[in-house]
């Protein structure tokens, strides 16, 4: 079986007039450029003189990211450099020729990092268990190290709007916190700025765009590992919501940018203590507000007198 796949059309359609299809593709490309441009502007993702490392996995998302950034680079208000970087993790049957041939054809500066993380993951993770988490950490470390040693000022990843929404619910359901996958962040060690220019782009548009552009897609499961079950369940939930209530994912994505700390309950984000407190009032003593004194706590509650 070939290690390069073609993306199916998500919704099979009857044969269309080629001119209509061309117009739709043009509109889609224009929409993606606008959304990526808006994300870059809204979050200050790219500045004059930036050297941007575009992480290219061979999947539809990273191909789309690189393609749109190359288009924007030609007319961007500031000059910046793009370099495509792929990490060859030595997975079984990985088609090593695909990305170099594709990138050379584009005339894009690129580099292939060769690091056998697959053997490490295979040795550490028991057979049948999901490898994705450890694999992701090792991949991130390799990419961060390369970015540091080669002077990259930004690291661009291909996560899109739907990824960000799914991560929000993963953290909500499994970690009891309201957090997600930000469009821009500084790495934990403080050395790198990571950007996600596809933050406003929906996955279905990426599927259509990758199909139209005929990217040489490399599947992400060559290692044989299965998708994280929890993430898969969240993905199915969101797809069902979108099917039952079209536009729901977009509403959730917008809500993530409309946070009202005073309408939540995090005392580190909003000073509830000062809200409505008199100037002469002492700060409340939390211990004094516990359920009675120690003696009272062990006693039976009084029976109200009728």
UniProtKB/Swiss-Prot annotation:
Which spans does this entry mark as compositional bias, Acidic residues?
Answer: 297-306
Instruction: Name any cofactors this protein relies on.
Output: Mg(2+); [4Fe-4S] cluster
Q: Name one GO molecular function term.
A: sulfurtransferase activity
Region annotated Disordered, chain positions: 1-25, 286-306
Q: Which residues bind [4Fe-4S] cluster?
A: 132, 135, 223
Spell out the InterPro entries in the cross-references: Rossmann-like_a/b/a_fold, TilS/TtcA_N, tRNA_Cyd_32_2_STrfase, tRNA_thiolation_TtcA_Ctu1
Q: Where does it reside?
A: Cytoplasm
Q: What class of enzyme is it?
A: transferase
Motif (PP-loop motif) positions are 57-62
Record carries keyword Iron-sulfur: yes
Entry cofactor note text? Binds 1 [4Fe-4S] cluster per subunit. The cluster is chelated by three Cys residues, the fourth Fe has a free coordination site that may bind a sulfur atom transferred from the persulfide of IscS.
Name its pathway: tRNA modification
Extract the Gene3D superfamilies matched here: HUPs (3.40.50.620)
- Cellular-component GO terms for this entry: cytoplasm
Q: Name one Pfam family in it.
A: ATP_bind_3
Bias (Basic and acidic residues) ranges: 14-25
Please provide the record's keywords in A-Z order: 4Fe-4S, ATP-binding, Cytoplasm, Iron, Iron-sulfur, Magnesium, Metal-binding, Nucleotide-binding, RNA-binding, Transferase, tRNA processing, tRNA-binding
The record's catalysed reaction(s) read:
cytidine(32) in tRNA + S-sulfanyl-L-cysteinyl-[cysteine desulfurase] + AH2 + ATP = 2-thiocytidine(32) in tRNA + L-cysteinyl-[cysteine desulfurase] + A + AMP + diphosphate + H(+)
Q: Say yes or no: keyword Kinase present.
A: no
Stated EC number for the protein is 2.8.1.-
Q: What family does this chain come from, according to its entry? A: Belongs to the TtcA family.
Describe, as the record does, how this protein assembles with itself and its partners.
Homodimer.
Q: What does this protein do?
A: Catalyzes the ATP-dependent 2-thiolation of cytidine in position 32 of tRNA, to form 2-thiocytidine (s(2)C32). The sulfur atoms are provided by the cysteine/cysteine desulfurase (IscS) system.
User: Any extra detail in the entry?
Assistant: The thiolation reaction likely consists of two steps: a first activation step by ATP to form an adenylated intermediate of the target base of tRNA, and a second nucleophilic substitution step of the sulfur (S) atom supplied by the hydrosulfide attached to the Fe-S cluster.
What is the protein's name according to its record? Answer: tRNA-cytidine(32) 2-sulfurtransferase
Organism this protein belongs to: Stenotrophomonas maltophilia (strain K279a)
> Which gene is annotated as encoding this protein in its UniProt record?
ttcA
